Amino acid sequence: MKKILVLNGPNINMLGIREKNVYGTATYDDLCEMIRKKAEELQIEVEIEQSNSEGQLVDWIQICHNKVDGIVINPGAYTHYSVAILDALKSVNIPAVEVHISNIHQREAFRHHCVTTAGCTGQICGLGLQGYMLALEYLAGK
């Protein structure tokens, strides 16, 4: 059975509370439940983690080397400047899909530049929580 690591960066735990006009009303628990149900449907195993700490995200990426078949990552604000997360993604050589709930390319100019995406197979943005499901489908098929 394939195993996928789902990593969520800073403030994703605040879904349903912060900027509902941008991120919607679903909570982080709702997102995790959606991911678990999708994993069951796809017959894959998922591990879901969230941290506001860049170093913790790097640690989880490194730990999963040779242990998972894919990574779904929403680096949050770290997307725009974390060379550490980029380097970690590149070092483990695991297919990764970067997900953003909002369309970061239609938001503030500083959000248009994505550093971490270069370490990923692809990026899904602007499709709400459905982006996570699409990423899981893609990685389950690899």
Question: Which sequence ranges carry the predicted segments?
Answer:
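Short acidic/histidine-rich motifs immediately flanking catalytic phosphotransfer sites
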Residues: 64-71
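Extreme N-terminal starter segment of soluble prokaryotic enzymes
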Residues: 1-4
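Helix-loop-strand module that forms the ligand-binding subsite of alpha/beta enzymes
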Residues: 73-111
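Short acidic active-site motifs
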Residues: 56-60
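Short, glycine-/small-residue-rich phosphate/pyrophosphate-handling segment
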Residues: 97, 105-142
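Glycine- and acidic-residue-enriched helix-capping/strand-helix junction motifs
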Residues: 15-29
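Short beta->alpha junction loops
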Residues: 47-55
